[in-house]
């Protein structure tokens, strides 16, 4: 739904790169809103590598969307973006920049009587007074919330409480656990999630198969479409909600589903259907961003839970599954940690838990 123009006669203007937006920014915008009728928030920058936000993986478009999301339910705040690509560097860039700001004000307001900029740098006061004398400029004190976007980018976990929820998805550390069936993936994910007080996304296929009472070897093309899309959606939802402390665990992803597709359907469906599933897998996998991937070797006993296909229980098939999984994951080999390599059957589960914690500490610098 399109936002209406800001109709107030007193408009506050707050601009910044917001890479990321933190609660100090929100505090400033809220103060500006309460001192005026409305506030126009301008997310500035570019989608080029000259922009520090873009260099940190937060493009101008992403920042714009996320800041809008922060104020989705505030009718007194409108968010727009200013693309600085092609503008000269400051100080020469002030003239085109101010002209573009004037365009955004005209676009988003209804002939306000008073415009007030809220800035944090004395230089901005001087330049805005020079190039936009019709507006007032107020130099604001730093928020009592002592944090900066630079500090957050340098150490997001330490400063997690300051990051606004939409931006948290960018900084979330995501740990994936994969492997063949009956290897202890789900148990390990649950144990790690409890230990680190983090949410987890469990294997969606199990919920799906129980709901529709369908076994592994009975899943068809339509089922796998659901498994690919819904597993991704379930995990993304946990990440996007931001109701965590910067760490989430996931049991299974699209790559595991792809191995099952290749095992069960490659020779049993039309090439057209197989290509459809492969394209869907490629799109889904490209959207997944993992910081650490645990691959569990098939050293535990294969358990018949009523849904598993017991023709996959032999060591040869389980080894093939693991090799194919590792082959598909090879583009991300720098993220992979193999669990169970040097374990025997007695120490397998204990070793996996210990080595997973060790890798999380060494790779992600996260301790209990």
Task: State what each model feature region is.
Residues 1-173:
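Nucleotidyltransferase catalytic core that binds NTPs
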Residues 57-73, 218-246:
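Short, structured active-site "lid" loops
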Residues 152, 264-327, 331-347:
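A glycine- and Lys/Arg-enriched "phosphate-lid" helix/loop adjacent to the NTP-binding pocket
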Residues 155-175, 331-368:
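Charged phosphate-binding loop/patch that engages nucleotide di/tri-phosphates or the phosphate backbone
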Residues 181:
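The conserved Walker
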Residues 184:
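Conserved glycine(s) of the Walker
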Residues 226-288:
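Glycine-rich phosphate-binding loop used to anchor ATP phosphates in small-molecule kinases
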